């Protein structure tokens, strides 16, 4: 760490993030987590290093996406995370985790980890398979990437345009977050306008 000190910081936050600010954080309890400039606060505490923060599913998506067409990310962990990309550009965040999906249960309550432990892995797999079909109709994605700690628990055959992402992908995604070619949405990060070549 001393030989290679950090120059930038990437944060994947489990909540709704916009312009480096936390809008809501349901898993932490919404009280006290409304419009919080978390990235700015961390930058000050970390010696002024530049900080970028987006939703954690979006960070994982940056590592997985191929940059063509509509790509959707579904993470299976404590809850259900989602991210949407179009031709490599991060689209506005869809917080489907708290949207009703079955018998007034939200995605979190239907395929989150608590639901998996209660329903059992076999039944939970059937639910995830159902969700894949729902997302295919809802988003009409070209590619669906499934990540998160519980992605390894999937036992059914995935459709040809669905793939599992390593749970460590967030590390690479955090690096890609700083590369101009991975940040076409310059409205979100205006400073990312200078192209420096292909990301490797």
Predicted regions located by residue number:
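Glycine-rich phosphate-binding loop and adjoining helix at the ATP-binding site
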Residues: 2-10, 16-70, 110, 159-180
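Short, acidic/turn-prone active-site loops that include or flank metal/cofactor-
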Residues: 77-80, 96-102, 167-173
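Adenine-nucleotide phosphate-binding core of ATP-dependent small-molecule kinases
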Residues: 1-5, 105-145, 149-200
């Amino acid at each position: 760490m001393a030989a290679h000190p950090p120059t930038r910081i990437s944060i994947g936050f489990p909540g709704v993030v916009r312009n480096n600010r936390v809008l809501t954080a349901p898993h932490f309890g919404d009280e006290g987590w409304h419009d919080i400039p978390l990235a700015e606060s961390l930058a000050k505490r970390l010696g002024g290093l530049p900080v970028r923060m987006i939703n954690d599913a979006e960070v994982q998506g940056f590592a997985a996406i191929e940059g063509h067409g509509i790509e959707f990310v579904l993470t299976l962990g404590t809850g259900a995370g989602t991210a949407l990309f179009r031709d490599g550009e991060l689209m506005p965040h869809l917080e489907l985790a708290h949207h009703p999906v079955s018998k007034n249960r939200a995605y979190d309550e239907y395929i989150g980890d608590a639901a998996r432990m209660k329903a059992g892995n076999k039944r939970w797999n059937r639910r995830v398979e159902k969700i894949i079909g729902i997302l295919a109709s809802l988003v009409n994605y070209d590619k669906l990437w499934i990540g998160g700690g519980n992605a390894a628990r999937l036992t059914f055959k995935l459709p040809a345009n669905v793939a599992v992402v390593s749970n460590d992908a967030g590390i690479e995604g955090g690096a890609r977050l700083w590369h101009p070619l991975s940040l076409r949405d310059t409205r979100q990060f205006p400073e990312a306008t200078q192209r420096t070549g292909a990301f490797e």
